[in-house]
């Protein structure tokens, strides 16, 4: 790989370097200042925003639900990558010289793969949870313990996938500078790095996005393409509306990730088509822009949560209540308002000519109602023809942010 790609690449520095060449990528000071400001925005926004997301969930007992644990894992992975890799990657890309030693060279090439893997498979787990909750509501849901086990498995697989790149990373002293690079085992066709590169790209991008796309397509057809019965209860309308809002929010999260990382993956597939492209002097600016877009994916989720979810918005307002231009809202009063199902009941609705079943099953110790006004009906008419009914007992308990989120 040529100079700029060898030193710049976080995830796939997989092309050999001509180490005899001097550093040809030198930028004027004003460009460095602009890029530094742009990358600083990512670090500050991502770290602060994702830490607040973790606080909103973990500091409020009823936010500690199955799906929200995956959101905590997602926030942790993104905040960690922003904190540990963004600044280092920027300085390396700008100066084309490695200042941080062998250990951090290995970590710098190792951790981003693990973090991206953990991020995208946390989103996949959320998509699977939404799929099961809406398409197969009568099936058993993950317990809190099982959810933590799944998160641990995600990280174990992430670390295993990233291990080869960290293991083969090394520093090399050139005539005027030190570079961080990956020395793959010798092979005439560089088969090891090519296979690894393709496997990583498939596993951390195309495969999970394919699974997520299928899950949300089926969920979307169920929630939007089906006709809501005209005589169904207000509670049913509220639940369907709430589920739609949640799915919309998660689709925005996934699409944002896909858009941010697509140019990055395309960029590192180009050496197999036109290796000489990386010898162009303008390629450093292209790389800085592409890397900024990829790294910026770590800062958007807190903004999306705040914009599209009332409870997260309230949590952010409370977290930043000391700011003079932010109204904290009725945080204390809102904590006293929540409606939760205490009995596990199946609410089955026959929807549209396809007889699509949309069931709502709420665990006695787990999920809570999502959006909409909180009511306490003693009996609900559950089908379009009124032939099936189920009594649901409810009671008012203290507020949970999650009552607006992902039941």
Curated annotation (Swiss-Prot):
Residues 1-31, 87-106, 170-194, 271-283 are extracellular. SUPFAM superfamilies: Family A G protein-coupled receptor-like. Residues 55-64, 129-148, 220-248, 309-407 are cytoplasmic. It comes from the Eukaryota. Residues 365-394 are annotated as: Disordered. It is found in: Cell membrane. InterPro entries: GPCR_Rhodpsn (IPR000276), GPCR_Rhodpsn_7TM (IPR017452), Neurokn_rcpt (IPR001681), NK1_rcpt (IPR000046). Glycans are attached at residues 14, 18. Interacts with ARRB1. This is Substance-P receptor. It comes from Canis lupus familiaris. The lineage of its organism: Eukaryota, Metazoa, Chordata, Craniata, Vertebrata.
């Amino acid at each position: 790989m040529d100079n700029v790609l060898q030193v710049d690449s976080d995830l796939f520095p997989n092309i050999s370097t001509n180490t005899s060449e001097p550093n040809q990528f030198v930028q004027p000071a004003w460009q460095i200042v602009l890029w530094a400001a742009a990358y600083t925005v990512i670090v500050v926004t991502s770290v602060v925003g994702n830490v607040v997301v973790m606080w909103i969930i973990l500091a409020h007992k009823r936010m500690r639900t199955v799906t929200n644990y995956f959101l905590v894992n997602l926030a942790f992975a993104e905040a960690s990558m922003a904190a540990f890799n963004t600044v280092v990657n920027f300085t390396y890309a700008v100066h084309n010289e490695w200042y941080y030693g062998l250990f951090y060279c290995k970590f710098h090439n190792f951790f981003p793969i693990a973090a991206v893997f953990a991020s995208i498979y946390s989103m996949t787990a959320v998509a699977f949870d939404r799929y099961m909750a809406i398409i197969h509501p009568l099936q058993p849901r993950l317990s809190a313990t099982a959810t933590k086990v799944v998160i641990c498995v995600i990280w174990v697989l992430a670390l295993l996938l990233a291990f080869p790149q960290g293991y083969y990373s090394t520093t090399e002293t050139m005539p005027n500078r030190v570079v961080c690079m990956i020395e793959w085992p010798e092979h005439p066709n560089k088969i090891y790095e090519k296979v690894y590169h393709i496997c990583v790209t498939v596993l951390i991008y195309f495969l999970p996005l394919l699974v997520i796309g299928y899950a949300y397509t089926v969920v979307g057809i169920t929630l939007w393409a089906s006709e809501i019965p005209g005589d169904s209860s207000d509670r049913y309308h509220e639940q369907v509306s709430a589920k739609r809002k949640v799915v919309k929010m998660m689709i925005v999260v996934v699409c944002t990730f896909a858009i941010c990382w697509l140019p990055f993956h395309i960029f590192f597939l180009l050496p197999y088509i036109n290796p000489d492209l990386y010898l162009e002097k303008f390629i450093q600016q292209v790389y800085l822009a592409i890397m900024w877009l990829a790294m910026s994916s770590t800062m958007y989720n807190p903004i999306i949560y705040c914009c599209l979810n009332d409870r997260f918005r309230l949590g952010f307002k409370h977290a930043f209540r000391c700011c003079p231009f932010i109204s904290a809202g009725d945080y204390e009063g809102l904590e006293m308002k929540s409606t939760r199902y205490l009995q596990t009941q199946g609410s089955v609705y026959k929807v549209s000519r396809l007889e699509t079943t949309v069931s709502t099953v709420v665990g006695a110790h787990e999920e809570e109602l999502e959006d909409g006004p909180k009511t306490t009906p003693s009996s609900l008419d559950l089908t379009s023809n009124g032939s099936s009914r189920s009594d649901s007992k409810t009671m008012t308990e203290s507020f949970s942010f999650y009552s607006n989120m992902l039941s």
